[in-house]
Amino acid sequence: MSSGGLLLLLGLLTLWEVLTPVSSKDRPKFCELPADPGPCNGLFQAFYYNPVQRKCLKFRYGGCKANPNTFKTIEECKRICAA
């Protein structure tokens, strides 16, 4: 690769680092999991972080055995995953 190509690559990597929000680097990996209602049949309102939309969304939670990306309140979801 030529020195010009290396400089371009270095510039792009630097730009990526600057534009990537600090919070996404520190966000727990479980925040990337999909909404998981679990196997139970309850109808509870819960929240999960949607990494594509970059926000917390409502979903119906069955009441048991969901993944860690399940929160009782939108505030808790935002504090942990969307900060």
UniProtKB/Swiss-Prot annotation:
Keywords: Disulfide bond, Protease inhibitor, Secreted, Serine protease inhibitor, Signal. Pfam families: Kunitz_BPTI (PF00014). SMART domains: KU (SM00131). The record marks 41-42 as: Reactive bond for chymotrypsin. InterPro entries: Kunitz_BPTI, Kunitz_BPTI_sf, Prtase_inh_Kunz-CS, TFPI/VKTCI-like. It comes from the Eukaryota. SUPFAM superfamilies: BPTI-like. Disulfide bonds join 31-81, 40-64, 56-77. GO terms for molecular function: serine-type endopeptidase inhibitor activity. The keyword Secreted applies. Residues 1-24 form the signal peptide. It is found in: Secreted. GO terms for cellular component: extracellular space. Residues 31-81 form the BPTI/Kunitz inhibitor domain. Expressed by the venom gland. Serine protease inhibitor. Belongs to the venom Kunitz-type family. This is Kunitz-type serine protease inhibitor blackelin-3. It comes from Pseudechis porphyriacus (Red-bellied black snake).
